[in-house]
Amino acid sequence: MERVIAKHIHDHLQNNRLLSDMQHGFIRERSTCTNLFESMNDWTMSVTCKTGISVAYIDFSRAFDSVTHVILFACLHKYGIQGDLLRWLTKFFTGRTHQTRVGLSLSAVAELLSGVVQGSGIGPVLFLIYIDDLAKWLESHGITAKLFAECRRC
């Protein structure tokens, strides 16, 4: 079920060109290779035109776990994911709990207020929607960037 919904959302995003072109990974025909190719092209053009280049590599540790559900739901609505589908996604994430075991001890049960399910069919596309505002903010400030999302457990 998750993979069917993920494909539907993914198709909606691509058909309506809703995601920034800066994003690579989890998008058809936009991978580490296209990220590297575009970066090398940008750098070559900067050297040829004798303009400055600043490069920053940022690795968001545990990025999939940092997705705040309330913000994700607002992003989904903004991207046209509404009605029954948004209600299903809200129910999918609401009320999830976790508990930690260390040896024989168990922590208290706590509700998960952030994170997309890693290893699920739907986590990657939801992360793309969540992070896309960063790409659009960078674009609006004249900053060229290449974003790449990946999940080693997906």
Where are these regions (language model features)?
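Conserved pre-catalytic core of RNA-dependent polymerases
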Residues: M1-V117
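Active-site palm subdomain of RNA-directed nucleic acid polymerases
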Residues: I5-Q23, T48, V125-C154
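Short, conserved phosphate/pyrophosphate- and ester-handling motifs at nucleotide-, phospho-/glycolipid
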Residues: G119, G123
